[in-house]
């Protein structure tokens, strides 16, 4: 499996733990096709330490699996530590590629040894959220724009956490993000500043290729300003 389609309804389920996308991706990318999944192995594959807080981390994973079972997967427990599962159907989603998932998990493990905080669960959630909103129509730029407050309200993450996740995704060259400052339309009406997201790379048949993100962002800015002027009669 080269990528995971994360259900949009799961991404927006802000009542659930922020680790929901991490565990969903880990479940599919590390255990898909196996008859039985081990909670211990899943916990480890998510990047959680099993040395000092094994029982706490595993209990949290079990709880999130239980939450996922409400709407997104069906589970059958063999015993308290192993289960089999099937994915429930869905229509809308955000894609996370295996190479992106592995790069984020590798960075989390490396920075943990350096005692630097790196919230990989929120980073995956923000990435899945942005991807779920990107316009896939060929005639439109494949971008998404929103305020940090909007993303916070829809994911359940704090603005500070989202801002940190965005910085990491930029540093890793997964997303390119530009801020469109407050602007005044032709009717002298001010519009709120937004962040514009574009993919740093595109994927085709498993191969990663550079994306024309600068052009995509410029087209998006023009579309935003054009729409604002039309709505005010400018």
Task: Tell what function each PLM region has.
Residues 1-234:
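Electropositive, intrinsically flexible nucleic-acid-contacting patches
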């Amino acid at each position: 499996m080269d990528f995971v389609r994360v259900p949009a309804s799961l991404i927006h389920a802000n009542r659930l733990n922020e680790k929901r996308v991490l565990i969903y991706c880990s479940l599919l990318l590390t255990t898909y096709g196996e008859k039985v999944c081990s909670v211990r192995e899943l916990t480890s594959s998510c990047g959680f330490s099993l040395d000092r807080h094994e029982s706490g981390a595993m209990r949290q994973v079990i709880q999130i699996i239980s939450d996922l079972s409400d709407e997104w997967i069906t589970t059958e427990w063999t015993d308290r530590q192993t289960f089999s599962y099937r994915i429930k159907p869905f229509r809308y989603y955000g894609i996370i590629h295996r190479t992106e998932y592995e790069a984020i998990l590798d960075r989390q493990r490396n920075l943990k040894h350096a005692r630097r905080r790196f919230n990989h669960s929120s980073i995956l959630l923000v990435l899945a959220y942005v991807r779920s909103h990107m316009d896939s129509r060929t005639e439109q730029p494949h971008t998404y724009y929103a305020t940090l407050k909007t993303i916070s309200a829809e994911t359940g993450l704090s603005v500070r956490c989202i801002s940190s996740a965005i910085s990491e995704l930029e540093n890793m060259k997964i997303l390119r993000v530009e801020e469109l400052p407050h602007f005044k339309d032709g009717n002298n009406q001010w519009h709120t500043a937004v962040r514009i997201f574009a993919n740093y790379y595109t994927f085709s048949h498993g191969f990663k290729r550079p994306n024309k993100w600068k052009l995509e962002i410029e087209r998006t800015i023009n579309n935003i300003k054009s729409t604002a002027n039309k709505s005010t009669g400018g």
